[in-house]
């Protein structure tokens, strides 16, 4: 199932098109992630593209917000990645978002919301009615964003253990 590209006018003068990732986008995704996280992870992103940009596309979604007009801004203004997961700890099939990033200078312009809306639509078309993500406790900006999109605490508690 192909994701229909959707062109929208974000709250800027930049026309944005949300579409599936392409191989030519990966250097831009790597650059955006490196600028935001201050960590270079090219091997990781190439692997994510291989798994989420090429395989099982009916249940995996790697979408980018493409800059359509402003040559002074980066080509990829943001991305979102998710997949349909089923039966983990008894959960019925649901959409999981595990990555979302927007160019820092383009935040608060509707790009993150456009990406979130696009992946929500893909999950819905694939037949799931619930969407989940995880947010670090010390990431209030991310928490506020996801809450502004209608997400709230779910029925699961994340647990972890150091393995040293």
Task: Indicate where each model-derived feature is located.
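A short beta-loop-alpha structural element at the N-terminal edge
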Residues: 16-29
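Active-site rim helix/loop that mediates acceptor-substrate recognition in acyltransferases
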Residues: 40-62, 68
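Conserved beta-hairpin
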Residues: 60-80
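Conserved beta-strand in the GNAT
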Residues: 73-84, 96, 101
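A conserved beta-turn-beta hairpin within the catalytic core of GNAT-like acetyltransferases
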Residues: 85-97, 107, 154
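Conserved acetyl-CoA-binding loop-helix of GNAT-fold acetyltransferases
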Residues: 108-121, 148
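Conserved active-site alpha-helix within GNAT-family acetyltransferase domains
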Residues: 113, 125, 137-155
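Conserved GNAT acetyl-CoA-binding A-motif
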Residues: 123-135
């Amino acid at each position: 199932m192909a994701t229909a590209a959707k062109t929208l006018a974000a709250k800027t003068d930049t026309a944005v098109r949300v579409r599936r990732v392409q191989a030519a986008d990966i250097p831009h995704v790597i650059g955006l992630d490196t600028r935001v996280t201050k960590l270079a992870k090219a091997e990781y992103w190439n692997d994510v593209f291989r798994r989420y940009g090429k395989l099982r596309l009916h249940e995996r979604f790697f979408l980018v917000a493409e800059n359509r007009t402003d040559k002074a801004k980066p080509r990829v203004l943001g991305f979102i990645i998710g997949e349909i997961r089923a039966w983990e700890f008894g959960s019925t099939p649901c959409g999981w978002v595990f990555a979302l990033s927007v160019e820092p200078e383009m935040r608060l312009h509707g790009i993150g919301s456009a990406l979130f809306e696009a992946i929500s639509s893909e999950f819905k078309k694939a037949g799931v009615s619930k969407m989940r993500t995880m947010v670090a406790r010390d990431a209030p900006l991310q928490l506020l964003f996801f809450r502004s999109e209608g997400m709230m605490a779910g029925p699961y508690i994340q647990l972890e253990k150091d393995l040293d």
